[in-house]
Every structure is written in structure tokens, then in C-alpha cells.
Amino acid sequence: MGIAVSGVIFDPPKDFDVSILNRAFALSLEKIEGKVYLLTNPKFDPRNKGDFIVHRGDRHICIMNSGVADDLLFTNDLTSYHVLSREFPAVDRMIFFCLYDSGGSYGYSAFADGELIRSKLYAVHEGHVESGIPLPAEGKWQPAILTAQEIIDEDFEDGDERRFFRHVTTGRLAPDTLVNSCIVDELLRAEYGWSPFDDDHPSKNEYYRAAEAERLPVSSEPAKTLGRQPEASSIRSFLRRWFR
């Protein structure tokens, strides 16, 4: 079973309430209680721009919704960041991310103190697109030379041009098409103690759906970035905030 979600995660502000999302994104979200979200019609899916999952943790708030994250990641539209920064002025760090197994797109954009410090995205048709100074989590994955046994295990054939990365601590292998997924997972765990890959805390999920007139169909999980990536800040001092 794969994963298909995008969103934004940040330090938990005081008095967070869904009414803030309604105001920020001009919506009328209604809470879906308990497991009833599994029975909704149409099916609940955070790739729908009207379906939101909010995960609350001791160290984070994560808002999962394609309308919040995808435009920023795929079309360089920073509206969501500016809107959330206005609503949460005390929050100085945010990470927007996407983990789309079905569309083959993985990546993130990290902000600190009002600046985009790093953007890293892999999309099927565009390949790797990145800007800014790599975060320490990326340095844990280095280009790998496969052993003879690994070549067999990965079913390499003549002319195979796949590239692999190896985790410097665990030795885990990841193809270049999936390494961003691994980096997002590690980055969020290190910074916020949680990742969307976790499924052992469903009770911390809250499910919301917009009024019918505000819903849009499931996003197509954009497979191609459009335009130029936004310029990342070159101020290295911002990076000291990550993995202190």
C-alpha cells in the first residue's frame, strides 16, 4: 500500500483551531467525526482540495491537503506560505512536502525566518529540480556503487541507467527516483518527531471537509514542475536552525 499525500508541517502555535484555516483559505470546513470519514461520499481524499487532514503532535501541526501544498511545490506559487505566515506570525519554520507514490513525485520546500532556504523536488517528467543549500538530512544519502549481489537483487539488466543512493549510517539503498521520499521522512522525524509514513497514531488525525460548493476533484498529482524554482536564500545562518 503506497502513500499519496502532500501538506505543510510547522511548530505548534498556541490556540490552533480549524477556524484559522477557514479564514486563511476562505473555506467552510466541517469536522468529520471518528472513522466516519471512511464512509464519506465522495470518498475522503486529501488530494481533493476540499478535504483536509490535521495531525496534532507535541512538536508539530501538520495540515495535509493538496490545495495547501501542491501549487507551492509544483508551480512555485508561494501564496500558501504567505497566508499561513500571516495567520501564525510566531511560527518561524515550515516545511511543505509531497509524497505521491502513484504520481512518482516526492520533495519538499523548507522555510525559516521568512526565507525559502531549500527546495528539492523529483517529478517523473522533470527529474530532479532543486535550489538552495542542501540540508544535513540530504548529506546522509550518498551516491552508491552497488555490490555484485545488490546488482542481482535490484534486477539490473544491460543498459540499465538507474542510479542509487546509500544511507551512510544504515546502509539502506534507495533509487534516485525515491531518495527524496526517504529524505522527507527523515527530515520530518528529526525536526518534528513524526512523519506521514507513521500509521500508529490515527487518533491524532482530525478530518475536515469543505462545503460542497468549495470542493474540487482529486488532484492529478502534478508530474511536471512549471516555470523556474524560486530563488532560495543563501544566508547560511538560517541552516543552523535545522538539526541543531
Language-model segments: which ranges?
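Short, extreme N-terminal segment that most often corresponds to the first beta-strand
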Residues: 1-31, 242-244
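Weak global preference for isoleucine
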Residues: 3, 9, 20, 32, ...
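Broad hydrophobic/π-residue packing in well-ordered secondary structure
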Residues: 4, 60, 107, 240-243
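Extended aliphatic helical segments
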Residues: 5-8, 18, 36, 54, ...
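Alpha-helix capping and helix-coil boundary motifs
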Residues: 12-18, 71-73, 160
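Exposed alpha-helical structural elements
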Residues: 20, 79-83, 234, 238
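Short, intrinsically disordered low-complexity segments
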Residues: 27-121
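Long, compositionally biased intrinsically disordered terminal regions
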Residues: 98, 113, 118-244
